[in-house]
């Protein structure tokens, strides 16, 4: 239909605003459109968005909130294949079949093994006209972390750091330095709200005394899970990140031998066997709890560990408009120059926040990870 792209495009526009807001499920937007048999006089009569904790599903919300007219036809537009399995409620396919919807259009087959293709099959078997694959690439870019989680069994990883013009992250080692201006800092809170989890090393907590939440008005309830790599389990418990651990989910990765030190129950602990952190293990553990998009915020050792590995998918660099000098702490090791690694990363965006600049790099890929 001529208007399919229009409605799917509108759905994707809304979808972008809800990335990171529906953990542990991916966000979905559904639009219910009423029309006659020739698709004239078409209009949106209901819509649904995945609930904050992943339920209810968008399709169910759009259907349950509307009283159907038997003299009209209805098309349901969804950004992802309707689910076919029961969870905390009926499946979306069963809700569709109970309604007066005769046609369903969606962007992508759900990569979850419980769904993939089953929703499509059930709808077709019951006489529903189904069309999928519209604006597939645009939808995939939003759902990329979800596909990583379901297919690669790890989150999509974005490494984010702030540097001076000469590539320093602080004026000296073990010293906190404010690199960016207030506008850049506000944008960081938006970025955090779009991720399921944010990861830092123990030294970042020790030196910066960071909180790692989304503290802009309207985003307070969408803070990511805080993940700390603390091998020795030796962080002072008076740090800010521990004071609000009951309110904001906090996970600490530490050596197994430290279990006797662990008495505080406000945070979760994942034990590791080896002294050296294994990034593959960490990412797999985070994927198991539903993390699709992971933001890595520091510090220098963590940055370089991810950049040296095969697990860095995107890089965000905020650059303050000043120089620090040779005494400063380098963000990257000498063999980790991103601009020289042009075979691996593309510069995809360049934004400006007053005098600050934000560069966004993305790993080159041959194809979309759709299966």
Residue positions per predicted region:
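Proteins enriched for Cys/Gly/acidic motifs involved in redox and nucleic-acid/cofactor modification
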Residues: 20-24, 120, 134-162
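Flexible, acidic/Gly-rich N-terminal and inter-domain linker regions that tether
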Residues: 1-55
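Enzymes that bind and transform nitrogen-containing heteroaromatic metabolites
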Residues: 2-25, 70, 88, 156-371
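Zn2+-dependent cytidine deaminase-like catalytic core
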Residues: 32-138, 307
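Short capping loops/turns at secondary-structure boundaries
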Residues: 112, 116, 132-135, 150-154, ...
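Short, flexible helix/strand-to-coil boundary loops that buttress conserved ligand/catalytic motifs
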Residues: 108, 143, 173
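Active-site beta-strand termini and strand-to-loop segments that position acidic
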Residues: 34-35, 151-152, 362-364
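Residues that form generic nucleotide/phosphate-binding pockets
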Residues: 14, 65, 142-149, 191, ...
């Amino acid at each position: 239909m001529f208007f399919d792209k229009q409605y799917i495009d509108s759905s994707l526009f809304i979808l972008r605003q809800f990335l990171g807001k529906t953990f542990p499920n991916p966000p979905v937007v559904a639009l219910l459109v009423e029309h006659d048999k020739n698709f004239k006089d078409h209009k949106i009569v209901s819509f649904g968005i995945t609930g904050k904790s992943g339920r209810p599903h968008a399709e169910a919300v759009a259907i349950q909130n509307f009283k159907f007219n038997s003299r009209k036809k209805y098309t349901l537009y969804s950004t992802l294949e309707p689910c076919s399995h029961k969870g905390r409620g009926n499946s979306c396919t069963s809700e569709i079949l109970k309604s007066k919807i005769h046609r369903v259009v969606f962007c992508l087959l759900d990569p979850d093994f419980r769904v993939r293709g089953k929703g499509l099959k059930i709808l077709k078997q019951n006489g529903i006209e189904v069309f999928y694959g519209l604006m597939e690439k645009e939808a995939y870019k939003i759902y990329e972390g979800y596909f990583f989680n379901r297919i690669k069994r790890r989150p999509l990883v974005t490494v984010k750091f702030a540097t001076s013009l000469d590539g320093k992250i602080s004026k000296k080692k073990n010293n906190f330095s404010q690199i960016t201006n207030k506008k850049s800092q506000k944008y960081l809170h938006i970025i955090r709200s779009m991720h399921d989890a944010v990861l830092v090393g123990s030294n970042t907590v020790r030196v910066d005394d960071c909180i790692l939440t989304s503290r802009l008005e309207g985003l307070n309830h969408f803070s990511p899970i805080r993940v700390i790599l603390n091998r020795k389990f030796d962080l002072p418990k008076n740090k800010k990140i521990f004071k609000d651990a009951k309110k904001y989910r906090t996970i600490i990765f530490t050596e197994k031998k430290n279990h006797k030190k662990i008495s505080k129950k406000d945070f979760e602990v994942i034990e590791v066997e080896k002294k050296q952190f294994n990034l593959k293990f960490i990412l797999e553990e985070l994927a198991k709890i539903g993390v699709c998009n992971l933001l890595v915020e520091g510090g220098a050792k963590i940055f370089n560990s991810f950049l040296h590995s095969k697990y860095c998918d995107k890089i965000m660099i905020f650059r303050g408009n000043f120089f620090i000098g040779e005494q400063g702490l380098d963000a990257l090791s000498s063999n980790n120059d991103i601009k020289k690694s042009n075979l691996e990363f593309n510069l995809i965006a360049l934004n400006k926040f007053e005098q600050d600049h934000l560069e966004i790099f993305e790993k080159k890929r041959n194809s979309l990870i759709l299966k």
